[in-house]
């Protein structure tokens, strides 16, 4: 009985650890400045500049001062993910940093994208893929006028 409990505990630990890393290559498999590229389940690390399969573009929608929030300046951005492949992108993970200073942590400050607790952005459940040669747009409102630093961390197709 004791060995069964130990085995169950071990299996639960493995399951939890596996679920903690949402991308197949793992969070630390590629070096800084590289993209984890997953093609038919095969993981490769390539330099960001060599990742032509997908691109991110940032557009300023508008900037304003909000008197109800202490006269702080806010900027709304649209981010477009473009699939340059002849095949669908199954999943994409986008890294952020301290520059992703959301107005607040509500659904009115970020939309059409999932923000994971570790700051990584992923496709929402209602957008399971990005079709070949198509694009998908998400947006957010940031405090200030500095755009967020966004980098493709992992792409699966």
Curated annotation (Swiss-Prot):
It is found in: Secreted. InterPro entries: CBM2/CBM3_carb-bd_dom_sf, CBM2_carb-bd_dom_sf, CBM_49, Dd_Spore_Germination_Stalk. Keywords: Developmental protein, Differentiation, Secreted, Signal, Sporulation. The keyword Kinase does not apply. One of its GO terms (biological process) is cell differentiation. The keyword Signal applies. Gene3D superfamilies: 2.60.40.290. GO terms for cellular component: extracellular matrix; extracellular region. Pfam families: CBM49 (PF09478). Transmembrane segments: none annotated. Induction: By the stalk-specific morphogen DIF (Differentiation inducing factor). It comes from the Eukaryota. One of its GO terms (molecular function) is polysaccharide binding. Residues 1-19 form the signal peptide. This is Stalk-specific protein A.
